[in-house]
Structure formats: structure tokens, C-alpha cells
A protein has these predicted regions:
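A short, surface-exposed alpha-helical micro-motif characterized by mixed small hydrophobic
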Residues: 146-148
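Conserved ABC ATPase "signature" region
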Residues: 56-74, 183-184
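Conserved catalytic motifs of ABC-family nucleotide-binding domains
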Residues: 100
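C-terminal boundary and immediately downstream tail of ABC-type ATPase nucleotide-binding domains
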Residues: 171-188
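ABC ATPase NBD coupling module
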Residues: 5-22, 36, 40, 48, ...
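Conserved ABC ATPase signature
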Residues: 79-83, 87
Length: 188
């Protein structure tokens, strides 16, 4: 598609709504500045969107969000290289939710993780979705991830939507041949 429209709670997207939509990238290590500590990485958006917060309030908020994603707040002075892939993904999620967005856009959120971490991250995202009423936009080739987290699915081919609907309906009875092939090859 050459154009489209994005609405958040009925409001057309504009730069002032950027806080309401945060990203979690496929490769969190590549998205982190290796010279920044966990405190600096996770609080970066707070410094932009809530500049009135003092250092103590910012540190407390970072500690709170780290605990929400299953990390201890005693890691604030550590650097990204000191963490496993799953821990880095938790840090990326913490960085995204610290400003309390309404929407998280997740690009292949588990593709770089081993199976154990994949399950933990999926469970964490489902919990955060329930606790905070988050809407998740998941970009993934892994149909198991889509089935685990999504309510609705859009299947794209060459940048065009070829099928959309409720996840269970599309997975149970796909209309497009391309979707049928995807599901067949994925074994779902």
C-alpha cells in the first residue's frame, strides 16, 4: 500500500502521540547504545516525555518497570553486553513500557531467542497486555507467536494485505492460497 491511516483510540496519528506507541526491536542488543547503563537505556524515554522527573523518581520508575518484566533493580549500573538475549529482550520491553504507552509494536519479538526464553517472553507479553491493557502489533513470521498473542491477524505478501481476520478463524479456515501455504509449512 502506498498510503493508509493509523488511529489510536479514534485519534489520527500525529507526532504528539509518539509516546502512546513504542517499539520493541528484533535485536535489542543492536538497539542499545553499548556505552549506556541499564538505568540510562530504560530511562531514556522518560527524559524526553517526563523531563520534570528528578533522578530519584526516575530511578524508582526504572526499578518498578524492571521488576514488571522480571528483572531485579540491582542491575541499573550494568551494561547491555552483560546480559543474555532473553534478558536483553526484557530490557527492551522495559524501555518500551516505561512511558506507559497504549500500543507496543514488536518486530519478531522472539526470533533471536532460544525456546526457553521464547516461552518466557511470550508469557511476559501476555501478562503485560492484560495488566496494562496494551494493544500489541506483532510483526512476525512465526505463526506460533501470532497464535499465542494476537487476537486479529493480517497476512501480507509483497507488502499487501491478502487476508485479515480473527486469528482462530484465519488459522482454521484461510481463504488465500498464500495463507494456506504458510499455515501448512508452519504446521499449525
Amino acid at each position: 500500500p502506498a498510503k493508509g491511516r493509523l488511529n489510536i483510540n479514534g485519534q489520527a496519528w500525529r507526532p504528539e502521540l509518539r509516546r502512546e506507541m513504542q517499539m520493541v526491536f528484533q535485536d535489542p542488543f543492536g538497539a542499545f547504545n553499548p556505552r549506556m547503563t541499564v538505568l540510562e537505556i530504560v530511562s531514556e524515554a522518560l527524559r524526553v516525555y517526563e523531563p520534570q522527573l528528578n533522578q530519584a523518581a526516575m530511578r524508582a520508575r526504572v526499578g518498578e518497570v524492571l521488576r514488571q518484566v522480571g528483572l531485579d533493580d540491582d542491575i541499573l549500573s550494568r551494561y547491555p553486553h552483560a546480559f543474555s538475549g532473553g534478558q536483553r529482550q526484557r530490557l527492551a520491553i522495559a524501555r518500551a513500557i516505561i512511558v506507559r504507552p497504549q500500543v507496543l509494536v514488536l518486530d519478531e519479538p522472539t526470533s533471536a531467542l532460544d525456546v526457553q526464553w521464547q516461552q518466557q517472553i511470550l508469557a511476559l507479553l501476555a501478562d503485560l497486555q492484560r495488566q496494562h491493557g496494551l494493544s500489541l502489533i506483532i510483526i512476525s513470521h512465526d505463526l506460533a507467536v501470532i497464535r499465542a498473542l494476537a487476537h486479529r491477524v493480517m497476512v501480507l505478501k509483497d507488502g499487501c494485505v491478502i487476508e485479515a481476520g480473527e486469528v482462530e478463524a484465519v488459522f482454521a479456515k484461510p481463504n488465500a492460497d498464500y495463507t494456506k501455504k504458510l499455515l501448512m509449512h508452519a504446521g499449525t
